[in-house]
């Protein structure tokens, strides 16, 4: 197995462990690295854990490293292939480096963007961190969901059209950002009573506290024409990027079988994905690729079942959240993304803004200059900033692709090559008890433990389809997700109300890798107990009965469940 040795990271892990040793004896270990020596047990059957469960990513997708920095590790598949290893390291640079306006090789930032680097949203390669404001800096993995609510307080409704689905709060000079991030307000409020009636004190007297965000953006923050009206805002934090190549390798027939299994026992499923009358997948459950591509055998593929993101918007990793985000978060164009991620309302506002026009009229080298007249600059700005303009082929200015196909290929080797750290402390009887409780409470109905990957004949776009990517065929993996959407019915819930079950693998190492362990889609849960109790906020939650069972556990058993979650 792959094991990166880094003395500085090991020292940091040691210092963290020393600090954590001051915790009360009855607190569960929070490091995720465990209190029980497990080296002699790794790869062996222990208690109610099989030998395979030590390797959540299978033998091809698991790293033995469980120290700080392990989220960055490549899989054994990459380690064993010199060309993939080199591409992985080059792709890692694409993820970690800041993009700029015009400095090669990481150029092309803007004109409107969310962050200047991928790692800003994925600190330590993990989940974003909870924020009390909206800085566009490292650690803030929040994306804004700005939408027209169907009713007062509703989580549902169409996105506003004036800004992009992932609204941008930064812009390259001389432009203004579509949303002025300095005017965004995030207020964290405390739940005073559970809608379900569950007390906020466990039967043994221990209390818990739940918080949720209220986000406001004044109309003055929008640099668009027109400005939006009648809108609400929700937060969505980034998901960790580790192990996504393994998820991509799960056969779609297996995921369809999971839908059918849940439908057969009466689970309410999102009608956008499951046609109850036909007892089959809905038409909108299928993703039609935005660019031409083939599977790894060179066969064309027209559509695939959606499996990635909270909202289940993407199907293949190679046209998935990362492949798309490295474009639309930065607005760095490439051969398969020749358009800007913008809106007509922003383009119009910029073409009418006096400071923008004056700056461009004073700079004959600007691609928006035209003949230098006000009318010409206005015309150039509007047309070149519109989302429908092919940046490489248009009558106004032919830009060049800002990310090369080789860079994109390296990025996808890195993305598909990220490993999952091995499980820890499965020999600990508390962890074994935690698994027993997890299963008996019904948590595994949604957090399905085990899947088996298929042949892994992955899809990829034509611009990189002739180059090999890491493959994970026929691996027994343990992501702890059913990859189906469910409703938790929380206060100020996720936009759209439905949320794909988040994989639990490796999350116990979040504190060691990112410095935070916030959970749930908007980081509202500061620890595992809060995350579980949010599942029981409403009796309409599809996980209410599991959360209610957790509520009734003794303090010792609750701690065992937490230790289990941190071990897997």
Where are these regions (language model features)?
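Bacterial N-terminal signal peptides that target proteins for export
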Residues: 2-10
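C-terminal motif of bacterial Sec signal peptides marking the signal peptidase cleavage site
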Residues: 19-22
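Short secondary-structure subsegments characteristic of cysteine-rich extracellular domains
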Residues: 13, 17, 435-438
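N-terminal cofactor/phosphate-binding cores enriched in small/glycine residues
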Residues: 92
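Electron-transfer interface patches adjacent to heme c in soluble/periplasmic c-type cytochromes
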Residues: 28-89, 99-412, 416-429, 435-568
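Short, conserved catalytic or interaction motifs in soluble domains
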Residues: 25
């Amino acid at each position: 197995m792959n094991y990166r040795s880094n003395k500085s990271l090991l020292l940091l892990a040691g210092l963290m462990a020393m600090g954590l040793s001051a915790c009360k004896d009855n607190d569960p270990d929070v490091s995720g690295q465990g209190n029980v020596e497990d080296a002699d047990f790794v790869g062996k059957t222990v208690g109610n854990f099989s030998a395979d469960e030590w390797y959540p990513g299978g033998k091809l997708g698991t790293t033995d490293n469980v120290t700080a920095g392990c989220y960055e590790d490549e899989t054994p598949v990459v380690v064993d292939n010199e060309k993939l290893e080199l591409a992985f390291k080059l792709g890692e640079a694409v993820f970690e480096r800041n993009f700029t306006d015009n400095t090669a090789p990481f150029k092309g930032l803007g004109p409107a963007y969310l962050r200047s680097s991928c790692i800003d949203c994925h600190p330590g390669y993990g989940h974003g961190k909870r924020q009390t404001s909206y800085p566009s800096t490292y650690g803030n993995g929040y994306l804004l969901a700005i939408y027209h609510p169907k009713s007062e307080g509703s989580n549902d409704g169409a996105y506003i059209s004036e800004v992009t689905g992932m609204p941008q709060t930064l812009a390259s000079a001389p432009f203004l950002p579509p949303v002025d991030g300095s005017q965004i307000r995030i207020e964290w409020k405390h739940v005073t009573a559970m809608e379900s009636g569950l007390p906020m004190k466990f039967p043994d007297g221990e209390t818990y506290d739940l918080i949720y965000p209220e986000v406001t953006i004044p109309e003055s923050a929008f640099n668009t024409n027109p400005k939006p009206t009648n809108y609400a805002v929700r937060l969505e934090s980034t998901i960790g990027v580790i192990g996504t190549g393994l998820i991509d390798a799960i056969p779609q027939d297996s995921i369809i079988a999971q839908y059918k299994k849940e439908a057969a026992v009466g689970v309410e499923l999102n009608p956008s994905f499951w046609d109850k009358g036909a007892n089959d997948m809905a038409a909108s459950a299928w993703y039609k690729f935005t660019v031409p591509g083939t599977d790894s055998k060179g066969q064309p593929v027209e559509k695939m079942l959606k499996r990635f993101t909270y909202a289940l918007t993407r199907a293949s990793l190679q046209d998935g959240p990362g492949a798309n985000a490295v474009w639309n978060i930065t607005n760095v164009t490439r051969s398969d993304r020749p358009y800007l991620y913008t809106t007509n309302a922003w383009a119009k506002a910029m073409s009418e803004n006096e400071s923008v026009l004056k700056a461009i009229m004073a700079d004959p080298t600007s691609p928006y200059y035209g003949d230098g007249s006000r009318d010409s600059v206005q015309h150039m700005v509007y047309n070149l900033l519109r989302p429908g303009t092919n940046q490489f082929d248009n009558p106004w200015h032919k830009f060049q692709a800002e990310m090369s196909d080789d860079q994109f290929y390296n990025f996808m080797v890195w993305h598909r090559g990220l490993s999952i750290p091995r499980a820890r402390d499965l020999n600990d009887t508390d962890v074994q008890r935690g698994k027993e409780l997890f299963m008996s409470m019904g948590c595994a109905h949604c957090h399905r433990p085990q899947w088996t990957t298929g042949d892994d004949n992955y899809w990829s776009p034509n611009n990189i389809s002739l180059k090999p990517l890491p493959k994970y065929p026929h691996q027994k993996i343990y992501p702890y997700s059913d990859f189906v959407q469910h409703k938790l019915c929380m206060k100020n819930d996720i936009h759209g109300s439905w949320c794909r079950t988040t994989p639990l693998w490796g999350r116990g190492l979040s504190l060691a890798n990112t410095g935070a362990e916030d959970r749930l889609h908007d980081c509202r849960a500061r620890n595992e107990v809060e995350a579980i109790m949010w599942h029981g906020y409403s009796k309409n939650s599809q996980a209410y009965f599991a959360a209610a069972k957790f509520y009734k556990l003794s303090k010792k058993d609750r701690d065992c469940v937490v230790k289990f979650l941190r071990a897997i």
